[in-house]
Regions:
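N-terminal pre-ligand scaffold of iron-sulfur
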Residues: 1-56, 74, 84-100
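Glycine/small-residue-rich loop that forms an oxyanion/phosphate-binding "nest" at active or ligand-binding sites
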Residues: 79
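Short cysteine clusters
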Residues: 42, 61-64
Length: 100
């Protein structure tokens, strides 16, 4: 299982952060010492979510305006097209992300 380990301070606060790992684009979102991670791709037209705007816990895709709750990945525009959150653990200012 691929794993990323980085410092919490490497992830900007309340701003989408793009990270490439093993050829896969990821978007990390840090809010109140919580970090969420998703594949950096809108399910609608595959625009990078890291280029989108983050406001009030919602990230908006720049392509067609689809909006996603960053805590759950739920699409607020078309609920059947939600994002699948990756497993994230924050411990002692370290962030570990795993996915299959």
């Amino acid at each position: 299982m691929p794993k990323i380990d980085l410092g919490l301070d490497e992830i900007p606060f309340e701003a989408p952060f793009r990270l490439e790992f093993n050829g896969s684009p990821l978007v990390l979102i840090r809010t109140n010492n919580t970090v969420r991670a998703f594949v950096d791709r809108c399910p609608h037209a595959h625009w990078p979510l890291s280029d989108g705007e983050l406001k009030n816990g919602v990230i908006q895709c720049i392509g067609h305006g689809w909006q996603f709750d960053v805590q759950t990945g739920r699409c607020l525009t078309v609920p059947v097209c939600s994002l699948k959150p990756l497993s994230v653990l924050v411990h002692q200012d370290r962030v570990c992300i795993e996915w299959e």
